[in-house]
């Protein structure tokens, strides 16, 4: 039997998703909890590996098992062995044709950026921060140059293992609410560090360091050295993974973050 799980986690507490020898990753903690509950080792396959400090609101995994358990028991039983910084949100039996990574046709990330002269300790690890004003319209104009199917080599890390740098970026939204600027990135898939590298460039434009059309030149150059430095991970959230309707994957629970009303208005499935 194939089981899919919806996972939420506080990325600030972990060294990324992928299992490591030191055991301080989300995958390590999840698989340990599953093994404790099931009394047998279970290997998970994830929709998308997140970096150190990146949060998960709508992460999806699957695993195969011969155990006959009530579906919701996978939620309650696994959570009983997880730290407070990780929680299974739902469980669902899936056909063998479902694959957490390869069945997904899109991913959505949100970035919450606190714009204020003084940093807030209450937002540490939860939102990015910049102390200088930003020009929202300039960032929107710059983002428009990135929409579509392109070679995003200028925005991939040197450690990226993707077979191709060509991705289709469907949408970038920029919305200001009070002292926050909220960004939404939706694409068929993302390269390693791609969203954080895009954020670094958008913020550089917003600060007036470059004109909006500079980003078109960076994209065309296909050279990581042309882009701005990688932006901090603190405010980045994997919000949604899109799957074909036939799998009826439950939606992510966005209400678990303070600015959920802003994000809920930006329907990740639109």
Curated annotation (Swiss-Prot):
Active-site residues from the entry: 51 (nucleophile)
Keyword presence, Membrane: no
Pfam families, sorted: PseudoU_synth_1
Binding site for substrate: 109
Listed GO biological process terms: tRNA pseudouridine synthesis
Keyword tRNA processing: yes
GO molecular function, one term: tRNA pseudouridine(38-40) synthase activity
Reactions it catalyzes: uridine(38/39/40) in tRNA = pseudouridine(38/39/40) in tRNA
Function: Formation of pseudouridine at positions 38, 39 and 40 in the anticodon stem and loop of transfer RNAs.
Quaternary state and interactors: Homodimer.
HAMAP family linked to this entry: TruA (MF_00171)
Name of this chain's protein: tRNA pseudouridine synthase A
Gene: truA
């Amino acid at each position: 039997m194939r089981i899919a799980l919806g996972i939420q986690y506080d990325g600030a507490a972990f060294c990324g998703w992928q299992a490591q020898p030191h055991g301080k990753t989300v995958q390590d903690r999840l698989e340990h909890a599953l093994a404790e509950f099931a009394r047998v080792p279970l290997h998970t396959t994830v929709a998308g590996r997140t970096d150190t400090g990146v949060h998960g609101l709508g992460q999806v995994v699957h695993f195969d098992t011969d155990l006959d358990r009530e579906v919701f028991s996978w939620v309650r039983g696994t959570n009983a062995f997880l730290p407070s910084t990780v929680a299974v949100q739902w469980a669902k039996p899936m056909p063998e044709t479902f694959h957490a990574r390869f069945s997904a046709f899109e991913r959505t990330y949100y970035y919450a950026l606190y714009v204020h002269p003084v940093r807030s300790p209450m937002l540490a690890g939860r939102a990015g921060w910049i102390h200088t004003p930003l020009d929202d319209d300039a960032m929107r104009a710059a983002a428009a140059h990135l929409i579509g199917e392109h070679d995003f080599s200028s925005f991939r890390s040197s450690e990226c293992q993707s077979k191709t740098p060509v991705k289709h970026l469907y949408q970038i939204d920029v919305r200001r609410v009070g002292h926050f600027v909220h960004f939404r990135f939706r694409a068929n898939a993302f390269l390693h560090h791609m969203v954080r590298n895009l954020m670094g460039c958008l913020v550089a434009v917003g600060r007036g360091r470059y004109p909006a059309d500079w980003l078109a030149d960076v994209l065309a150059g296909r050279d990581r050295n042309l882009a701005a430095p990688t932006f901090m991970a603190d405010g980045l959230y994997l919000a949604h993974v899109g799957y074909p309707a036939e799998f009826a994957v439950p939606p992510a629970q966005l209400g678990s973050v303070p600015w959920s009303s802003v994000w809920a208005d930006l329907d990740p499935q639109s």
